[in-house]
Amino acid sequence: MSEAETLFAALRQSANGDVVEMLERMVRDAPDHALNKMNALDLAAREGLAEERVVAALLNAVALGIFEMTWNVMCLSCAGVLSANKSLKTLDRRQYSCAFCAAGYETTLDNLVEVTFTVSPRVRRIAAHSPDGLSVAEYYRQVFWSSAIDLPADLEKVLDEVTLESVDLPPGERAILSLNLPAGTLIVFDPVTHTAQFLDVSGGETNERQNLSVIFNKVQVPVETIALHPGPLRLTLENRTDSRVLPAVWMANQVLDNLLSRRKPILTAKRLLTNQTFRDLYRTDTLAIGQRLKILSLTFLFSDLKGSTELYERVGDLVAFDLVDEHFRLLQEIIVSERGAVVKTIGDAVMATFETPDRAIAAAIRMREAMSDLGAQRQHQSLRLKIGIHEGSCLAVTLNAQQDYFGQTVNIASRVQSLAASRSIVVTKSVVDNAQTQALLASNGLKPALKRVALSGIEDEVSVYEIS
């Protein structure tokens, strides 16, 4: 049995069999580019498999060494990768900028960071493992662009339609290009160093030769648009890096606009942090101590088992422990099935996160029914949950050696839960205002009741809604 066969046999012990079979087939038969920067959501859609099963299988495959995981900071405008990271620990900048789009971005995990998967060279070597050997078109496909852009099969042909001139420039070398500039906006761009120089070619045509020099190095500096006239240009390109660069002169035409507008869903860092398989595998090695990464919108659910002290007194420690343990098992099962993750348990309480408010609401409705059913089955009618939900911004941090969250959103969610009566779900306005939440509540015949309350540590009163 080969090493790959041994690894896939091990993967079958922890992942869905259909997904494992698909991944093994891809590693064996798929073209190189299909095994580089794999988009888990796109892969699930193409193969007709459940997204969460594909994500879980890929995460377990990373743990076994079959695939490698990359956290790519990407430009929201052009979908180019601004920084590729083997771990969230190396996202150490507060802002990233894209020279091609002249745009800057605050580092957030909501939609700026994608997570992709590439086959490990120990299982199969692919061209992307040696990017210096890639053609220009394949460098753009496999290195520069993120998995958020839906690149056409004939990418090389499409790039030809936007490229006035290009060159593969070795380290330390210089090239001189003679061009005849058309009117319009042109971009001298290199995908390796992310260097861009914009040219505004307008006005009357000239017969006199114009001159321009562009230097490529590892330092990105803001550049102003240079005004030129249509006509001849002597363009000097100098590579001052220790690797090849791939500068090209692009025309900002409709073909380029159409290419950049082709998008598909991605596995975001935020979604992965709310994945239970990820937390189970990587909860202690996600962020560096002291590192803080911002999330603009995350939904927190807190639950607490009402009357647990009386339960211990009534049925005894052994029976009560079994009931509480079963309660934790059921809650985690429901949370995971609604695409959430348990962050931690505190006594009889659970703290969980969800990517969107509606998934937290769906989980909460199921959780309280599951507790009623469990209480009835065990003939202990007092198994009732108090649940609170809030959505807002927060920081992903490391606390007590585990990945956790910090901020006012977490505090409010916890305090909202303390307002819940037996079997009630108390949520904040941001949760109820979510369109998917409203549709879910309506489909379940539930009408939230508004009230204004004071929360400890919060200066102003807060609008909360009770779902009975």
Describe the predicted segments one by one.
Residues 423-468:
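Cytosolic regulatory/linker segments at or just downstream of nucleotide-handling modules
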Residues 106-195:
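Long, charge-rich boundary regions
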Residues 1-66:
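N-terminal alpha-helical interaction blocks
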Residues 284-362:
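Catalytic NTP-binding/metal-coordinating core of nucleotidyl cyclase/transferase enzymes
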Residues 227-230, 236-296:
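Regulatory cytosolic signal-relay segments
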Residues 374, 390, 410-433:
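Catalytic/regulatory signature loops of cyclic-dinucleotide turnover enzymes
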Residues 302-303, 334-362, 373-409:
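Catalytic core of nucleotidyl cyclases, primarily class III adenylyl/guanylyl cyclases
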Residues 63-132:
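Cys/His-rich short segments
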